[in-house]
Every structure is written in C-alpha cells, then in structure tokens.
Amino acid sequence: MNERTLFTTFWTNESTTTRNVLARIPEGSTYRPDPKSRPAQEIAWQIVCEEKMLIEALETGRAEWAPSPLPATMKEVLDAYDEQRARMARRWNELPDARWDGTLEFFGSQRPGSTMAWGFLFDIVHHRGQITTYLRAMGSTVPQIYGPSADEP
C-alpha cells in the first residue's frame, strides 16, 4: 500500500468517527469549559473548514484559510460535513501525484503536500478530541472512537 492509499484509508475511517462525534453535539448548546474556549459548534465548523481548505490546497497547489461564516445551527454544520464527506474519497483519488508528492504554498512557505495532509488529519483528530471532552457536560454521550466508551461499551 502506498502512502496516499494509506492516508485515504485513514481519512475515510477518521471521517466516519468524526461524523459520529459531531452528531452528538446538542443543537443550540453554547457550552464552553472556560471563557477562553470555543463552543463545540465552532470547533466542529473549524473541522469542516479545515477539510475543505486541505483538499482545495492539494487540488490547486495553494492553501488559503478563508472559512465560511459559522452556520446558525448544528444541523447546518452536519449537513455541510455530510455533503463534503460524500465527495472526499473521489477527490483524494483524483489528485494528481504531483500535488500529493509536490509542495504547496501555505501561509507564505512551501510545505510538502503529503506532510500537510497528514498534519491536518492529526489536527482534525485533535479538535474532535476537544469536542468529546465537552459532550457529557452538554448532556450528551461520547461515542466509541478507537474502542468502547463509557456510554457505548
């Protein structure tokens, strides 16, 4: 298995888990564990925007962080994630090798495409983990991630 196939496999699996976590965010929740922390819906939207930015960067050769405004509802966030996720595998597979193996412009510096992809996948997993620490405090449950949770043994 080559690195890109491995990445696509991991991305697909992690996006399923991410979707399960995002679906647990209660509609209308403004919970944040600290005034410096962001609410879960805002973190969820960052995940959506990071995924969009990454695939577009790999397609065009240039990363531009210009997230769309935060949707008013969690349902809108989930709908956007579902729509984007449905097209991601095809988009990963259609990337020219030169984009995956080449460099991308990222905030004024050049970064290897594959390294950037893995880095963003890990960042998305990190933000997903942040959300899981909010879920019970918001009155929700934590889904299985890499194995059972206290809520889903």
Q: Positions of the model-derived regions?
A:
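Helix-adjacent hinge/juxtasegments
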Residues: E56-P96
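Short, contiguous alpha-helical
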Residues: T8-L22, E27-P69, E105-P153
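Active-site rim elements
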Residues: N2-T8, M74-L78, W118-L121
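Acidic catalytic patch
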Residues: W92-F107
